[in-house]
Amino acid sequence: MSPSTPWKPTGNPAAPLEDRPVGIVLAGGASRRFGRDKAALSVERGGAAETLAERALRRLSEVCADVVVADAGRCVVPGARSLADGPGRGPAAGLLGAAGAFPARSLLVLACDLPAVPAALLALLVKVAADGGADLALPRWREGAEPLAALYGEKALAALGRRVASGKYSLHDLAEEPDLRVAFLSEIDLRPFGPPEEIFVNVNTPEDLALWLARNEAG
């Protein structure tokens, strides 16, 4: 997919629409450490170019029928729906903007700067949440939980809204809310997808990008 090619969804889930999660690409960050907009950064895939935002959107579209981009209304992916931020700041603002656009729907979230997260892992998050009736499902490994590749149910999003209203913007602490049912993917669950430090490589700097690209070429 080239940056100029409008995106089209490919997912075809069998569940009723209202029961399916909406795929949310988080792409609203300021990219201060990178020095330019990461979401619009073009990388090679199989000889073709795609942006990091397009890559995340493609992965989510393998799992979700509805996929949109929470990019503070910047329209970083041609043809994809662009969402304005909600209240708060950082990823929480993107999540709450999406929650406002899709009330009563769960959200399957993937940040554009997590380019190595596979669609199969995202699908596992959906399954684990559905099987256990979880309000929040996310991976957890020795470096901690990863809230930017996670499934947020309606109750978790409501809790996030209350936290943001009280000035708490971090997603990392949301799982500690006592009224939420939280499901974690353990390192054993993650093992089929590769080493966690490679799955969750975060492209914050040009050096991070170079490392991820080198790993891709090696693999």
For each feature predicted by the language model, list its residue ranges:
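Serine residues within intrinsically disordered or low-complexity segments
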Residues: 2-4
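Nucleotide and nucleotide-moiety/phosphate-recognizing core
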Residues: 7, 11-199, 210-217
